[in-house]
Structures are given as structure tokens and as C-alpha cells.
Amino acid sequence: MSAVYVVRPKADHDLDEQTYYFATKAGPELGHRFLLAAHEAFRLLATQPEMGWHPRLKNPLLASLRVFRVSGFDKMLVLYQPSPDGVEILRVIHGSRNIMALVHREGVE
């Protein structure tokens, strides 16, 4: 059985927003490159879910949350959690955002 990744609705929305941002600021090619790099990161995480690091969050319900950088877009972070078949992609955010505040304010699901 091959490893899979599932992109949750908030992560899908994040991807749309970031792709649009890169495309409007630097051209459609950059938006497309970002989208390809993000999905490549998702595929890699699905096969090696322990690659990311644990953010320091006080909420015990988020103990399985992990973070990984998108290659070529090092300020873009993938928030995910391992699942029995691979990973669930919860959010895709800019690294300048406060992960703890974001998770508490907007959630990850």
C-alpha cells in the first residue's frame, strides 16, 4: 500500500491564496512552481511523516502536529499530522505567522 496525503479544506484554501499571491506578485510561473513544490513536499511527507519538527504548543490535543518547509519557498510552512496511511495536510502558512496564535484562533481542521 502506498503512502497518501490528504489536503484538508483550510490547507486547500491556504494553497489557493498563496498560489494567487505568488502569481500576482511575480508572475504565473512562480505561482505554478509554488504549487508544484508544495505538492512535492506533501508526497515526501506522506512517505516520511517524521521528517518535520514539533512546534512548541501547549495544547495537548495538538501533540501530533508537525511542521515542514516547502523546498524553494523556505518561508512557507506545511502544518500536518501523521495518519495511519500517510499524512493529513492541515495548513500551509508563511513562516512569519505565529503558529500558536493561528492554531488557537483559526484551528487546523
Language-model features, listed with the residues they occupy:
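Basic/aromatic recognition patch in beta-strand/loop cores that engages polyanionic ligands
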Residues: 47-85
